[in-house]
Amino acid sequence: MIKKRNTTKISVIGAGSVGATTAYALMLSGVATEIVLVDVNKSKTEGEAMDLSHGADFVKPVNILSGDYKDTESSDIVVITAGAAQKVGETRLQLINKNINIFKSIIPEVVKYNKDAILLVVSNPVDVLSYVTYKLSGFPKERVIGSGTVLDTSRLKHEIGKRYKIDPRNVNTYIMGEHGDSEIATWSVTNIQNIKIDEYANKENLEYNDNFRKEVYENVKNAAYEVINRKGATFYAIALAVTRIVKAILGDEKTILPVSTLVENYYGIKDVYLGMPCIVGGSGIEKALSIDLNKTEASKLVKSAETLKNTLNNASGL
């Protein structure tokens, strides 16, 4: 549990597009009194901290610093965005060997100065790297969280909301499994303000069939690739997703978010990190929820877990 104190310190490891934008989103949210940026490119980190600090007049009081791992000491949350960026045509899982080696140098340094922090992994492939962080840190699973499928779930809500012309916040659903190509949409539990999606579509004379589900799912699954093809990287939406997770932790909200967590016995899945609805609060992940999936969804989730396990088993440097 994060201890109540007058200051809240968040460190962001990696000051690339995702890290810098995350720091910006955290600054706007007003959740932290201190934000520390750490990156191997110290000049860029200094520049990002300066640029952010120059906006201090427009937000709640917050101290933005650039520094090294020693400066992260006693952070409440350490957000890890460092790693090789995903290139055009490259899958998240193809990043693994590059980023495992990077994490082997980062995590021991983070742990050295932050014995009680919650670690929030954002770097891709996030599920695999969350597991790597869990193993390297020696922290309990509750305090090693991956950003998981929080963003993917938002993308799914956006797609449904756009097609049905409703506020996406009124769509209740989850993307589960890998944050990547094997992720699954949980159509069987999807509802619009507690009305099952098929019933809602029928009442409102809206499309809901195999073609609808396929199109929506493909758009969600391929969303990052489409953004990368157009602008080179994704960073705004993931920064907002990270900020949402951070707020849930710092506010001890006990809110349900599909973060990446260590799964130990769910449809036979165990010893792998993947996106699942979890109660997120001051202790980190307080409980993973075992929601009932239909047979098709459960089978796909098992395959998603197998994909992640195979990637870990085939990765070099572990």
Curated annotation (Swiss-Prot):
Swiss-Prot/TrEMBL GO biological process terms: glycolytic process; lactate metabolic process
Keyword terms of this UniProt record: Cytoplasm, NAD, Oxidoreductase, Phosphoprotein
EC number in record: 1.1.1.27
Sites of Phosphotyrosine modification: 225
Disulfide bond found in the keyword field: no
Gene Ontology MF: a single term: L-lactate dehydrogenase activity
Principal subcellular localization: cytoplasm
Claim: Phosphoprotein is one of the keywords in the record: yes
Residue positions binding NAD(+): 18, 39, 44, 69, 83-84, 105, 122-124, 147
Family matches, as Pfam families: Ldh_1_C, Ldh_1_N
Catalytic reactions of this protein: (S)-lactate + NAD(+) = pyruvate + NADH + H(+)
Gene3D superfamilies: Lactate dehydrogenase/glycoside hydrolase, family 4, C-terminal, NAD(P)-binding Rossmann-like Domain
Protein residues bound to substrate: 86, 92, 124-127, 152-155, 234
Any one annotated GO CC term: cytoplasm
Protein's pathway: Fermentation; pyruvate fermentation to lactate; (S)-lactate from pyruvate: step 1/1
Annotated active site: 179 (proton acceptor)
Entry-linked InterPro entries: L-lactate/malate_DH, L-lactate_DH, L-lactate_DH_AS, Lactate/malate_DH_C, Lactate/malate_DH_N, Lactate_DH/Glyco_Ohase_4_C, NAD(P)-bd_dom_sf
PROSITE patterns: L_LDH
Cell compartment(s), UniProt: Cytoplasm
Family according to the record: Belongs to the LDH/MDH superfamily. LDH family.
Function: Catalyzes the conversion of lactate to pyruvate.
NCBIfam families for the chain: L-LDH-NAD, PRK00066.1, PRK06223.1
Subunit structure and binding partners: Homotetramer.
Protein's name in the database: L-lactate dehydrogenase
Organism encoding this protein: Clostridium botulinum (strain Loch Maree / Type A3)
Gene assigned in the entry: ldh
